[in-house]
Structures are given as C-alpha cells and as structure tokens.
Curated annotation (Swiss-Prot):
Signal sequence interval, chain numbering: none
Assembly notes: Heterodimer of a large membrane-associated beta subunit and a small pyruvoyl-containing alpha subunit.
GO MF term (any one): phosphatidylserine decarboxylase activity
Cofactor note: Binds 1 pyruvoyl group covalently per subunit.
Protein name: Phosphatidylserine decarboxylase proenzyme
Membrane topology: Peripheral membrane protein
Amino acid sequence: MKQYNDLFKIIHREGYIFIASFALVSFLLASFNEKLGCIGCIATAWCIYFFRNPDRFVPISDDLVISPADGIIQEIKEALPPPELGLGDVEMIRVSIFLNIFNVHVNRIPANGKILALHYNPGKFFNASLDKASIYNERQSVLMETAQGQKIVFVQIAGLIARRIVCDLEEGNEVKTGERYGIIRFGSRVDVYLPLKTALLVSKGQTAIGGETIIADFGRKKTTEFKFDRK
C-alpha cells in the first residue's frame, strides 16, 4: 500500500483527472488505430511528467527567501506590488520567474512566516514572458510577513496556455519555507516582491529550482547595486 501512496504523492492531485482522461482517450484510440494509440500514450506520459510533484531539499533559515517555482529568472527590477494588496506606492524589488511547459509547476512557500492577505484578480492571458503579464494577466497575489518581520509578496500569474491557478492558502495561515501551496496549469510565471534593501542572491537568466534556490538573504547587507530596467 505504501508504494501506491508514494506514487500518488509524486503526482499533484490537480493532474489526476487529466491523466485519467488522456489514458482513457489513448485506450479508445488504440482500439481503432495502433499509431493513434501510441500518440495518445505519449500524450499521457507527458501529462504525468507535467504534474510531477518531486521532493526538494529546502534550506532552513528564517533569513532566507527561496524560489517559489522552477524556471528561469527572467527579470529583476523595481516595481510596484499588486495594488489589490493595499501596499501603496512604495516600490519593491520584483524577481520574475518564467515557467515553461517542461518545468515543475507546483509552487512553494518562499519563507517562514504568516499569510496576511490573499487576492485573486481575473485578467488576460498574455504570454507570461512579457512584462505586462504582471499587470494584466489573471493572478493570485499573496502578502505574507516573514519570521523576521519583513513583508514580501508572491504572485501566481496565468500565461498564454495556463488557464487555471490553484492556491491552497488562507489568510492567517502559519507557513514554512518550501511547503507546497498551489500549482499553475500549463506554462506560467511567478513574481516575488521584496523590500528594496534586500540582498539578492540570484541574477537574470539564472535557472531557479523551486524550494531550493535561495533568492535573497535578509541576514546580509545589500552589497551589490543592481541596475533596473524601467519600461
């Protein structure tokens, strides 16, 4: 029984219906045409791969902010946080992580702390790699206070293909770094907003691993002056 439980743990529950549907269609196609059945099996295998839910080795420290998602650090810039969270016109450092369809899409809590507010904002479905996706696309914004008293924001953003954001958090939740909290289906983006004086440990173009890559360290002084693009 444990082996079956382990199997289900490595696949996110949001994928069960898709995998079952793909498998059923593959079976039906195979009964009519062997080649179509093979194509269906490949599609089913890809679906299983997409919804994989691997364990990660999470750095443990109240000072650290880790990547909430797998992907490429697409942009680091000064930007206003989502207005729906009520943080005003104070700019923060925005670290944008782009996920392609081959990345793990399970999202993780970036720091120890408490969830202060959540807000779902319906919107467009522009390509998640575009800067305007942070403003106009469908998104789920989360404001939290870290164990060190810092307020940070992380945002799940739907993309051109992604059409469903899943967030399992509730206001008042006490959370731990690296805990799974949601998923975005089929290509997306996650933005992390940090205070301006935060010492960043990542750079544009770097590959991030959700739950493992350290984005920032509140215990360090900011020693590097980053140049930001204003667009």
